[in-house]
Amino acid sequence: MPRDLNIVVLAGGVGGSRFLRGVRAAVRDDSGSTVTAIVNTGDDMWLAGLRITPDLDTILYTLAGINDEQRGWGRLGETERVSAELQAWGVGWPWFTLGDLDLGAHIARTSWLREGVPLSDIVTRLTARWPLGVRLIPSTDDEVETWVEVDDPDTGIRSMHFQEWWVKHRSGLPARRFEQRGVADATPAAGVLDAIRDADVVVIGPSNPVVSIGTILGIPGIADALRETAAPVVGVSPIIGGAVVRGMADACLTAIGVDTSADAVGLHYGTRSSGGLLDGWLVDTVDEALVPGIEAAGLTARAVPLWLRDPETSAALASEVLSLAADVRR
């Protein structure tokens, strides 16, 4: 593996955090390498007067080693006394729990936002508390929120925040379309475009292609930066054996007319040689039969183990990503 790499990863929450942990481990012995994560903010929302940033917080807690691995979100050893009190007062959403430790971050973030501090600067302040080994940048400082238009059997067609659709309804209401409100007027956060331009490797992580990666790419300027960077752009499939690894990406892909398959997602991103975003694409070993078709479409593809079962498998996958990027660069 080449040394002294500037690695940039586009990432969502749980899958992105586990992959980033692997990238950090893969380059740990190379003090000259840097890892930068450009993180989805489309899941963000206002709740009980506080600005909540689920994906940023999940990645922060995971890299800091203080996350709740069993739940996949929140702080380890969390209590929920304040959340219970809020619910007793009828404040917030009873189905969306705010942990007591988590609330500390939300209150600090909201206080700084009300003082006019940009979200990217706030993330720098929050991450300074722990040695993450990864630089986190929100995709934008502007408010962008993902909303879902659903078929509700009780009320008909209506729109709701993504968190309501996912957390309350467990994506059980059929999604008609996804809307990233505010994305057309958003600008990339400070450092985002420079990171992509100066990267040696850019990775589209194994996060939801629609509501995580799709939201990042929808911010004007970011997709163009991926097309124009001199770095190889490689991606990791979030689909294994025709099924999602975690979450609701299958329902999201169906809503935009993309099959839930590793090859379909790779071709959805497209090849840079044809105006798309990717040079290389990794699928799982169970999808090895898809590799020839992917390569026929112009993408360099490999089949490797994709399951992020533990830090070791995450690091092994990260090494495969960097190996593919090196081959694409040649």
Predicted regions and their residues:
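Extreme N-terminal starter segment of soluble prokaryotic enzymes
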Residues: P2-I7
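A short, Lys/Arg-enriched amphipathic alpha-helix followed by its capping loop at the start of a domain
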Residues: R18-S33
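Short Gly/Thr/Asp-enriched flexible loops that form oxyanion-binding sites at enzyme active sites
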Residues: L20-R24, S212-L226, V291-E295
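Electropositive, gly/pro-rich neighborhoods at or near active sites that engage anionic ligands
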Residues: D29, V39-Q180
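A short helix->loop->beta-strand "cap" motif at the edges of active sites that frequently abuts
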Residues: S31-S33, T229-V233, L278, L299
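Active-site glycine-rich loop that binds ribose-phosphate moieties when present
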Residues: R176-A195
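Redox- and metal-dependent alpha/beta enzyme cores, enriched for Fe-S-associated oxidoreductases
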Residues: L217-D259
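C-terminal functional extensions of proteins
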Residues: R246-R330
